[in-house]
Amino acid sequence: MLKEHLDPRKPSGTGYTSKVRVRDKYHIVGFISSGTYGRVYKALGKNGQKGEFAIKKFKPDKEGEIIQYTGLSQSAIREMALCSELDHANVVQLEEIILEDKAIFMVFEYTEHDLLQIIHHHTQPHRHAIPAPMVRSILFQLLNGLLYLHTSWVLHRDLKPANILVTSSGAIRIGDLGLARLFYKPLNSLFSGDKVVVTIWYRAPELLMGSRHYTPAVDLWAVGCIFAELLSLRPIFKGEEAKMDSKKTVPFQRNQMMKIIEIMGLPTKDIWPGIVSMPEYSQLQSLAMSRAPGHFPRSSNLEGWYQSCLKNGGYATSSGAGTPGADGYDLLSRLLEYDPTKRITAQEALEHPYFKNGGPISANCFEGFEGKYPHRRVTQDDNDIRSGSLPGTKRSGLPDDSLMGRASKRLKE
Amino acid sequence: MAANYWASTQRRHWLFTKERLADIRESFRERDKAAHSQFPLPDQRLLNIYFSQQLIKLGKRMSTRQQALATAQVYIKRFYTKNEIRHTNPYLVVTTAFYLACKMEECPQHIRFVVAEARNFWPEFIAPDVSKLGECEFALISEMNSQLIVHHPYRTLSELQPELSLTSDEVALAWSVINDHYLTDLPLLYPPHVIAVMAIIVAVVFKPSQTSFHGTAAPLAGAMRDGGMNILAALGDKNGAGPPPRIQKLVGWLAESEVDIRAVIECTQELVSLYEIWENYSEKHCKELLGRMVKSKNLDK
């Protein structure tokens, strides 16, 4: 009732009207993907602004028909803050952030490819391995971006092929910092914030074991999984996720742990002294006891896995540019090291013989590659396109304000 | 880089000169002279004291850490370099800065809880509807260009503690000096490490015993005014035989470090004048002036 009396010439500084409008600056050409956070669209710059863009729209929550401001999720806040701060050739480039109509639009450079799509392409119509020099360039750029994140005290926490973007000129960009966060003396332990991180297939053993104080090493495990997947064209540890129960306690990911053990052998306190103090240690023991002795290998079979992977992929048997060879195996085994304190760091990995030997590494991972990858799929209809078989990343722990709002509303009804 | 101050948005976009800050404030005054004469407000530092006390109230029940309160104070300062305070509801800005800072500093609080808590303290200024706070969050983020990562001097302090073998009393005093610097413009004027060094000097030169901070800072102001001359002299004269060994060690370290000593001295003076003006602080007065402004301009609607 009082609103009419407000002097229109002096709008309240806390009210909000966007100074920039997305549609004035960008022409939306289609829909790329959607997730728990919202949707990603492909757009072209307008009014003299050249180039292609990917616009990530964080969905505003709908309470009834009228969209209300309900507070932004912490994941959106983190991604906005970190992307505004970071600047590196191997980390996705943020163009700008527009806050409009109670929604957030993060405008990124457009990337034509991502590793998920590239890996998929190599299984069609029949399996044909990704050339060894390309794998090496991808991995080098990925580690280079990760080193930058880690020296900036940023943990990515959700590295997986779908989040590793590739430009049409073969540059790798680490994308999706929605789960990333600073780890310099956090106010709360990292565990208390988000109870579940990293898509299960790429989740490090210390997370599966319930570790409360995890480190950048979780990202390096994920890089190891990605390396293996680039070579074999399949996720190396393709476990099934045990869902969170109604009490919101995080279950032991028995199946995923089993997949790791099948290749890496049972972790023991000799190779990983810290394991005995892990919260899920008893679960691991009961898992080991549940099978006949000898069911799980006592020692790592990674080398066997690697050799047959090279053979199946038709990588050259003698050393040279045609194969990741023995150096590649050594690096992989250091990335997939059980003990996070012994696992190779991004810095060490970049100095590994796999990169030192075997000549220069191109900043264009497609260099010398004859094939062509299909363009990113952009659809005109705005329907949900979910890749049903892929497990998503849980963004729990931090109750998304908007979701909580909805849940409590439902409860009342 | 997120954790590297030198490449940070804080250094690139949120560091002002004194003159620039004064120009900004003068331009606000020029643009709305009527409001300025109709609604006089206390000195900015007194308002800052008031805001910080409101933040502490808000944070208390939610057991918020000091760093989140510090971040909130920086957000408020940044916001008011873009907005005339007389066009805003400061209670809403304070609450929103708190809500946003808690998320950024990884101690998130639910929006409903924050609004409920704020209404406990200022029922007449905070609407029960959370959407007001949500809208203000958009305004805050937008005015700050989503540059939400704040570098604080606390980190430098804890890094320097072993190097300068600071006692726990000295660290505690330096810590509270850092807390106090958020009541001035210093966070917008100097890098965090300069502030930390200033706080350490103050702590080492003026013993903790002399001080009971917050509210009764007058003795410290006096001590700093008188004793400050000594350290300033010592800093200028590296061969001086005057100050005790403890201080000499610090002076030696300062001379070798690449810290901008002139900036450190300017910060000390800024702090001295804060403690002087603090004597005039009246919570009631701030509350009345702000309340009158918000109510008669309907800024709470």
UniProtKB/Swiss-Prot annotation, chain A:
Primary site of residence: nucleus
Keyword hit for Methyltransferase: no
Region ranges (Disordered): 376-413
Compartments where located: Nucleus
Class of the enzyme per the UniProt entry, highest EC level: transferase
Listed cofactors: Mg(2+)
Keyword ATP-binding: yes
GO molecular function: ATP binding; cyclin-dependent protein serine/threonine kinase activity; metal ion binding; protein serine kinase activity; RNA polymerase II CTD heptapeptide repeat kinase activity
Subunit structure: Component of the srb8-11 complex, a regulatory module of the Mediator complex.
UniProt name for this protein: Serine/threonine-protein kinase SSN3
Organism: Aspergillus oryzae (strain ATCC 42149 / RIB 40) (Yellow koji mold)
Lineage: Eukaryota, Fungi, Dikarya, Ascomycota, Pezizomycotina
Designated gene of the protein: ssn3
From Swiss-Prot, chain B:
Domain of life: Eukaryota
GO molecular function: cyclin-dependent protein serine/threonine kinase regulator activity
Domain Cyclin N-terminal stretches: 53-142
Pfam families: Cyclin_N (PF00134)
Keyword set includes DNA repair: no
Alphabetized InterPro entries for the sequence: Cyclin-like_dom, Cyclin-like_sf, Cyclin/Ssn8, Cyclin_N
Keyword Cytoplasm annotated: no
SMART domains registered for this protein in UniProt: CYCLIN
Keyword vocabulary terms for this entry: Activator, Cyclin, Nucleus, Repressor, Transcription, Transcription regulation
BP term (GO), one: regulation of transcription by RNA polymerase II
Main location: nucleus
Compartment annotation: Nucleus
One Gene Ontology CC term in the entry: nucleus
Quaternary structure annotation from Swiss-Prot or TrEMBL: Component of the srb8-11 complex, a regulatory module of the Mediator complex.
Summary of the function given for this chain in its UniProt record: Component of the srb8-11 complex. The srb8-11 complex is a regulatory module of the Mediator complex which is itself involved in regulation of basal and activated RNA polymerase II-dependent transcription. The srb8-11 complex may be involved in the transcriptional repression of a subset of genes regulated by Mediator. It may inhibit the association of the Mediator complex with RNA polymerase II to form the holoenzyme complex. The srb8-11 complex phosphorylates the C-terminal domain (CTD) of the largest subunit of RNA polymerase II.
Family: Belongs to the cyclin family. Cyclin C subfamily.
Family matches, as PANTHER family: CYCLIN (PTHR10026)
UniProt name for this protein: RNA polymerase II holoenzyme cyclin-like subunit
